[in-house]
Amino acid sequence: MTDVNCLTSEHIAPTTTTASPPGTPSKNAATDPVEPTSPFVLRAPPSAKSKLILQNMEEVLNSVKQKHREKHKRKREEKRRAALMEDQKSTTEEVKANAKEKPQPLREKSSQENGLKNGRRRSSPLKSSTPVADNQSIMKHFAKAGKPENVGVSPVSTAKPKPTTNVFEFMMNARNRSLGVNEGGAESPADQEIGSEAATPTTKRKLLLQEWNERKGGAKRRLADEARGEFIELQMEQRAKRLRKMLTKTDAKEVTAPSSAPTDPTVKRLRGRPRSRRISSMDAQNQIVESKPPVVKAKDQDPGTEELLSKLSSPTKKRDSLLGYFPKVESPKELAEKVIIAIETPPMETPKRRTLRRKSQQETPIVAESTPSSRPRRSCVGKARYDYDLETSPGKQQKAKPQKADESVEIIDLDNSNPAATPKKLAPLFVRQLPKPSPDPSVLKARQAFLQSGVPDKIRQEQIRQKNFDQMYEDSYEVFPRLAHIGCESFGSKNGPLDIPFALRAEEEYSEVTKALPANKRRAKASSITSCLPADFTSSKTLNKFNYATLPQLENKRGFVKLWKNDFDRFPTFKCYNQMREKYRHFSAIDSAQDTQQMGESLVVTRRTRRSMEQNMAQNEEEAKPPPSAPNGELLFTEKYKPLLFEQVLVNLTPVQELREFLSSWSGNGGSNRNSQGMDDTFDMSNDSASMGSSSNTMVLVGPSSSGKTNAVFTLANDMNFNVLEINAGMKRTGKKLIQELQEATQSHQIRKDGKAGGGSSQQLLQKLQKSGLKAKAAAVEPPSEVRKSLILIEDADILFDNLDAGFTDAIYTLAASSKRPVIVVATDPNCAHLQRLMQQNIIHFQAPNALNISRFLAVLSLMENCPIELDELISVYLYNQQNLRKTLMELQFYIQSGGDSTRDRTGGGIKSPTKTSNSRLATVDGSRIHQRFFEFFTSPQNVQYRIPFPVDFSLLRLNLPDLMASSAMLKEQQAAGGGSRTAAKRKSRSPKKAWLSSATGQKSDGHSSSLATLASFYDNISVASLMDSDCSDRLQWHLSEEIGHLLVEQALQTGLATKECPYNLFDKPVQRFSICQHLGNGVLRSDSAKSLDFEPALRSICRSEKERAGLERKSSRFYHYLRNHTVNVTSFTTDYFDTACSTFQSAAPSSEPTMEAEPKD
């Protein structure tokens, strides 16, 4: 029975402390309130039998609970009404009595005693039989069977008055009770009765669910879970004990120096853990740890309240139970047994304990381990205190001050070996950063192996294989190979003789013909690759070394412009001259200042230099002279003479005007300061731009290379105060990076920057020119505002790289949809597939500038650089460069800096330039000349003996082949049988720019067609070369085909014919030709399967059969045409295209075309 009493008292502790439960001996009931359990006594853990008895009692009580439930319900209903009248009378009396009492802290009492006045019940004693659900505690049923006699006046309640209810203690005690039960805090029994009556349906439903759960074996499952949990806790506690013993043993090995401070011999130091077990000693000799005096308590606190607060201060508690907060009521027999066990226990670990700092005895509260061993041990480190709301005596506060002082002095004595120093925390900027030691390669390898330990074997093997392959590739591959076995095979390196289908002259005859050439004909230069004949070495001795000289400064440039104005129809000659003169003056003055002061590459001009420069420019209107070291400046012509404002655009004005109208809706003032529009115009533009739709913020500029697309954007951005954010093909244009860099710019309307758009050194100089150069409008110019709106420019959007531009197209459409700033997309290919959606919305087409306007612009530019060039020469070079203005400007700058035409070159012979050397189209001032060798300078390189000086357009080759064959020096003269020789007739001029660029050679040529027949195979070969890479749409396509074509033609003519000077035709007649090969690639042209699967004969056959059927029927519209759905124009069903296809090849061979009734495949 001892074990049973022990277990039952443990569960009764939260609700009843002084009253004895039914079933316990009377001696326990008498001794429990008189002799309270000492908190310093170590209790033995419950035996295994007590756990089994506890499980059996829970099963029995669960069955008893169901039988008594109905009985208690009937009693509650009968006694509720009688108790209601008595409660109303007692309520008024209790209110008056409670007003006179002093507040006292809540202390731990029995469930019958909570809420009573002077230990007497306010309501009927029959009320005690009401069941109270207390977290499914098994002892709640014993409280219902108690007799009224047992509920008497307890000694504890009579000794002290009722304490004042503390809010926190009330909440902590109330959470142990179920909902609807407010036994401890209720003051009016009427409220309890009303609450119980209202909660009757809920209680019935809850009881019904509990019955169903018990029928299904819920109690057994709950007991099994609790047993399993207790077993796990027991195992964990045993493991913790073993680890604690191991730690204690390891700590005992460490030798610590004893403290020099005097210590009290009667007090032994505790273990290092703040939570140490203390037991009360019965004998001083067998004492393990001496008991310390209890904590000084407040006057209004009782032992139960103090013990409750000390246990609430524990930071770790059992999760599912609140029994750890209350002491376990034990019988005196158990206490005696535990005392004997504590006395007989030998001090096993006392000598090994490590002494730590000795603190005050009154600081650490004494906590008795009254919980069973299965409960987790609670740590007191950083515990919270719950007694702040209690009324404490002033004596305790006064004693706390010297305790802290003693403690501080004692800590200093113990730690005298390590003197305390005030730490100084410095900012990371002032802390010396020590270099990190290089990690050990073996450690890094071990870490890498640990991180890859979870990787599957298949992936690891693949990574190792890839790594080995990369290593092998790096070791074996050389960027620049040491030995190159691939070379260019010369034409004369073959062993066998060169097979030529026509007769050649002997070497003696060829040398005689070469010596017989006139003196004004062009010969090979000293640095050229010649045929190594004796005549070449003889003529090379007479060549003198030539040095290029600086061009002389022209004095009367305005006189040239006045003479040219009449010839330049509909071109602003004087406006162009004035703009270029201002730019030339400005940059020449800057270059002179830099050359004088020996300034660096930063192009910075000091204030003094700028002042003197402005004064000189204001006083002297003459042209500024550049320094001798850089007679034409240090900037490229493409940067030096590019337009800065909209009014400076002279060519290709229509697309620039359209782009300006698009940007004017985004600009604040509708344009620049000098070209600002009125408020009404700006308002109208904003309304128009708003009506463009959701995609009005994006514009696509499409045009060939060097047509002025990018230059127009930067010009208008500078004119309309925009800041350009450029993205070109040289950047890594992934979609993620593009969105991250431009998302902020697209969402913000303005960007504040002090710098100018374009931000380079040349751009800064151009801005200075913009402010100080144009004097006529200087008064109207206002300083530009610092607030610049952003503009996004995406260059080369039609060029995509698979590895570097992942997600670039999606990023463009995302920016176009979400951007609040204008987005301008520049493309060269109008048929780009991934930009078709943007091109269908807003697009501006740029065309190559007109040859006549560009030639006049370049003529004025060359005049400003003191090198006037013939207008026809500029047109020829511009057309030769496929209307590439950038390339023409670069070649023009190289030609001017090279000195223009040299005296020797003017007298020497060679392939004639397409100009008239006798008469020039441009008028000149007396004493100056016009340079006329610009075209020949780039079409006749020095390292080639003979070169065709016109673009190798193979449609023009048929026009010039007879003249080339007639001028051949190696072909023997032949005459056709019965035919005489005739001289070649001169061609008449049909060119809009100049007369036909041809002259009679005076040589005889045969009228026989054998000359063309000898080059038939050669014509086929160069036809294939002209079509190479026809399916590629990049900027190098034309140049590559041009070089290949030139190489084929020049080597063939030089090796097989050895042609000399001959006239040529640069402009072809406007003849309309149809060529299917222009739309096919190399693979199709050289593929036999493509030729055998040609579908055009089948289509022509279908068209002819449909035409014959329509002519034979009465109504031609009865049946639709077979190819009706495949017309060029979907909205029109005309058959004119099919009729045209029927007439193809009909006149040449009407019967040669077979009739085929094949149907086109889908």
Swiss-Prot record:
GO BP of this protein: oogenesis
Annotated binding of ATP, by residue: 703-710
Disulfide linkage: none
Keyword Lipoprotein: no
Biased amino acid composition, Polar residues: 125-136, 998-1008
Disruption phenotype: RNAi-mediated knockdown in the ovaries, results in lower DNA content in the nurse cells and defective development of egg chambers. Simultaneous knockdown of elg1 and enok, results in relatively bigger and higher DNA content than single elg1 knockdown. Further, egg chambers in ~25% of the ovarioles are able to develop beyond stage 9 with morphologically normal nurse cells.
Biased composition (Basic and acidic residues): 79-111
Keywords: ATP-binding, Nucleotide-binding, Nucleus
Region feature Disordered, mapped onto this chain: 1-136, 144-163, 179-202, 249-319, 348-380, 611-634, 666-697, 900-923, 975-1008
Tissue specificity remark: Expressed at higher levels in the germline nurse cells than in the somatic follicle cells.
GO cellular component, one term: nucleus
Biased composition (Basic residues): 65-78, 268-278, 984-993
Biased composition (Low complexity): 666-676, 684-697
Protein location: Nucleus
Main localization, broad class: nucleus
Gene Ontology terms, MF aspect: ATP binding; DNA binding; DNA clamp unloader activity
Family statement drawn from the similarity comment of this UniProt entry: Belongs to the ELG1 family.
The protein's role, per its UniProt record: Has an important role in DNA replication and in maintaining genome integrity during replication stress. Promotes PCNA deubiquitination. As component of the Elg1 RFC-like complex, regulates the functions of the DNA polymerase processivity factor PCNA by unloading it from DNA after replication during the S phase of the cell cycle. The PCNA-unloading might be regulated via interaction with the Enok acetyltransferase complex. Might have a role in restarting of stalled/regressed replication forks during replication stress. In the ovaries, has a role in nurse cell endoreplication.
Subunit structure and binding partners: Component of a heteropentameric Elg1 RFC-like complex composed of one large subunit (elg1) and four small subunits (RfC4, RfC38, CG8142 and RfC3). As part of the complex, might interact with the Enok complex, composed of enok, Br140, Eaf6 and Ing5. Within the Enok complex, interacts directly with Br140.
Name used for this protein in its record: Enhanced level of genomic instability 1
Species assigned in the record: Drosophila melanogaster
